[in-house]
């Protein structure tokens, strides 16, 4: 009941923000010049192995990439995907360590919110329901993206 009310409130908030954005004057913003680092082919190969469910191969490829001084912008992603491989293999403690690595070593990385969500999923699958709820509720308080927020709420709905 509480989650439904929370989701309804969040959906209203999203609609309000979209309307504000649509009615805002179109101001041209100056682009910051970021040096876009090219994604190493090894990263794409490791991700492809994960997507084709070859988790052991994917872990090996990501670990090798992690040891080869990858671009800084990918280091959190590498740890995240290693964790996702471990989770798929039901190696929950190893997955938890990887997601915690993302949160502790790369607190400003682009995988922080996803890692909090996956950390909660890992605890849930491990059977530590109260810890999973604690992690997921804590993740909600940290302003995740709408997509991740939806996943968190759905996961909380499943385990509560």
Q: Which residues make up each language-model segment?
A:
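Acidic, proline-/serine-/threonine-rich low-complexity intrinsically disordered segments
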Residues: 1-61, 68
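Short solvent-exposed coil/turn linkers within tandem alpha-helical repeat scaffolds
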Residues: 68-74, 104-111, 140-150
């Amino acid at each position: 009941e509480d989650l439904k009310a929370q989701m309804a409130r969040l959906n209203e908030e999203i609609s309000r923000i979209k309307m504000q954005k649509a009615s805002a004057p179109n101001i041209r913003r100056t682009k910051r010049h970021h040096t876009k680092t090219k994604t190493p082919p090894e990263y794409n190969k490791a991700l492809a192995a994960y997507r084709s469910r070859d988790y052991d191969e994917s872990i090996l490829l990501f670990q090798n990439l992690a040891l080869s001084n990858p671009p800084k912008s990918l280091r959190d992603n590498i740890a995240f995907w290693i964790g996702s491989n471990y989770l798929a293999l039901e190696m929950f403690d190893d997955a938890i360590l990887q997601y915690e690595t993302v949160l502790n070593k790369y607190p400003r990385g682009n995988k922080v919110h996803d890692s909090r969500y996956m950390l909660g999923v890992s605890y849930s699958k491990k059977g530590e329901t109260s810890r999973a709820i604690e992690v997921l509720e804590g993740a909600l308080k940290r302003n995740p993206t709408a997509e991740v927020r939806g996943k968190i709420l759905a996961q909380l709905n499943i385990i509560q």
